[in-house]
Regions:
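Structural preference for beta-strand elements that scaffold enzyme active sites
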Residues: 51-55, 86, 113-115, 135-138, ...
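Active-site mouth loops of central-metabolism enzymes
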Residues: 53-71, 112-121, 162-166, 215-220
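Glycine-rich phosphate-binding active-site loops on the catalytic face of alpha/beta enzymes
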Residues: 131-148, 186-193, 232-249
Length: 249
């Protein structure tokens, strides 16, 4: 079992416990389905020469503890002040030391739209994402089959959530080429080996002829990396570790 399989198995196990504490019907009763707020996450990225989705995360399996004095609200305010277009907040608890409360807290102070960064494997998590104030969710192609991708993306649309479908290779990219409303994210980190190569985004961008917003994720450490990607018509970047450590600017 690789680390991705381990995280997914753990997510499923914890989700069953969560459903016992608060069943789906209870969760749904807290969402006003007749007055759903529309997301502006996608709009915040479109039409700019350079858009940064700035990520808030305390730790990761590859880097270990990233931020010792972790303050998600202060970090969100910092990101907004330097001109980030949107935020990404890790909510996975065991491997990234995230929490949905971080997203809730940031939502109260930040005007930026927020991506809930987690390992979504169940409709429950999508309803929960709407309830806690997320504007966008992440759907990872490698952990979802085609039926799940279709079901989850349709539910996101119904809830007025934008969604990023994350791919890692050409085969996954081919699976999602007809998702015209999706933001396409290319993770430069192999989630099975955790090796990073930003050329992965360049390679897959050449294969992708659709008009979706295209995001390069992971391994972007300098403006030079961004400039290299922009030469290949990639203008949206999700940056986490280097921003959290204060190494980027």
């Amino acid at each position: 079992m690789n680390i991705l399989d381990e995280i997914v198995a753990n997510t499923r196990s914890k989700l069953e416990d969560k459903k016992l504490k608060e069943p789906l019907d209870s969760l749904l009763s807290k969402i006003d389905m007749d007055n759903l707020e529309k997301s502006n996450f996608k709009r915040s990225l479109d039409g700019k020469s350079q858009s940064i989705i700035a990520e808030i995360k305390k730790a990761s399996p590859s880097a270990g503890l990233i931020s010792k004095d972790f303050d998600p609200v202060a970090k969100a305010e910092e990101y907004e002040s330097f001109g980030a277009s949107a935020l990404s907040i890790l909510t996975e608890e065991d491997y990234f030391q995230g929490n949905i409360q971080y997203l809730i807290d940031v939502k109260t102070v930040s005007n930026l739209p927020i991506l809930r960064k987690d390992f979504i494997v169940d409709e429950y998590q999508i309803f929960e994402s709407k309830l806690i104030g997320a504007d966008c969710i992440l759907l990872i192609a490698s952990i979802l089959n085609d039926d799940e991708l279709k079901l989850f993306s349709e539910l996101a649309e119904k809830l007025y959530l934008d969604f990023i479908i994350e791919v890692h290779d050409k085969d996954e990219l081919l699976r999602v080429k007809n998702y015209s409303k999706a933001i396409i994210g290319v993770n430069n980190r192999n989630l099975k080996t955790f090796e990073v190569d930003i050329d992965n985004s360049i390679k897959l961008k050449k294969e992708f002829k659709e008009s979706n917003i295209f995001v390069s994720e992971s391994g972007i450490k300098t403006q030079k990396d961004i400039d290299k990607l922009k030469e290949h018509n990639i203008n949206v970047f999700l940056i986490g570790e280097s921003l959290m450590k204060g190494d980027f600017f």
